A protein has these predicted regions:
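Glycine/small-residue-rich loop that forms an oxyanion/phosphate-binding "nest" at active or ligand-binding sites
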Residues: 105-120
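RNA substrate-binding interface of SAM-dependent RNA methyltransferases
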Residues: 71, 128, 133-199
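Intrinsic-disorder-associated, low-complexity terminal segments enriched in Asp/Asn/His/Tyr and depleted
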Residues: 10, 23-24
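Short, aromatic/basic amphipathic alpha-helical patches
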Residues: 89-100
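Aromatic (phenylalanine/tyrosine) cluster motif
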Residues: 4-5, 20
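Boundary-proximal intrinsically disordered activation/regulatory segments immediately upstream
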Residues: 30-85
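Short acidic-hydrophobic, aromatic-tinged amphipathic segments that line or gate anion-handling sites
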Residues: 32, 106-109, 195-199
Length: 199
């Protein structure tokens, strides 16, 4: 594998331009460019519930959550890395996992990420994730969450539902938003296994 990582490193350190290589294991487009002002505005906007649902997008923060999303095939739109996170092993691993995915990879200034991030000690990695379309309920086992207002409790319940093999969760109107960044972190990847219906 050393040759593969050397090629990946060459891509990372190359000038900001679209690259496409067919002779190595990462066969996706890797867009190495700085985040635009519009990117940053969009990131900030997705920390508000109304904007998440208007765009059907939500935020993932941290290496493990983003890795879990990629492994499970959950649709990602953009991944933002600080230079330090790109240089780290987990950053290179995430780049290698983008095999066969058309995900835009952009750099972001760590100070800007710190201002945007919902966590005090972020890992320098943030992604925009697409919400699944809400399908009709077919699963016989359904969890209904009624007026669960605490984001941590909501995330724990989603995680528990996924662990017990429940695939459909219906969430009442006055409950915490299941796509709130705190809920997403607390759920620890449960979103990628569940059909979540709101309101």
């Amino acid at each position: 594998m050393p040759g593969f990582f050397q090629k990946l490193w060459d891509l990372i350190t190359a000038p900001p331009v679209w690259r496409f290589k067919s002779d190595h294991q990462v066969r996706c487009k890797i867009m190495l460019q700085e985040s635009s002002i519009n990117d940053l505005k969009r990131l900030r906007s997705l920390f508000l519930k109304k904007n998440r649902y208007a765009n059907r997008l939500f935020i993932l923060e941290g290496y493990l959550l983003i890795k879990e999303a990629m492994i499970s095939g959950y649709p990602l739109e953009n991944i933002f890395f600080t230079q330090q996170s790109i240089d780290a092993n987990h950053g290179k691993e995430l780049l290698s996992l983008c095999n066969n995915l058309n995900v835009a990879v952009k750099s972001i200034d760590p100070k800007v990420l710190h201002q945007i991030s919902d966590t005090k000690n972020n890992q320098g990695i943030l992604a925009i994730c697409k919400m699944r379309d809400e399908a009709e309920v077919f699963d016989k086992r359904i969890l209904v969450l009624y007026e669960i207002s605490d984001p941590g409790n909501m995330g724990t319940l989603l995680r528990t539902a996924a662990w017990f093999g429940i695939r459909t969760v219906i969430i009442s109107e006055k409950s915490a938003d299941p796509y709130n960044p705190k809920v997403v972190r607390s759920a620890m990847g449960a979103h990628f296994l569940l059909e979540i219906k709101t309101n």
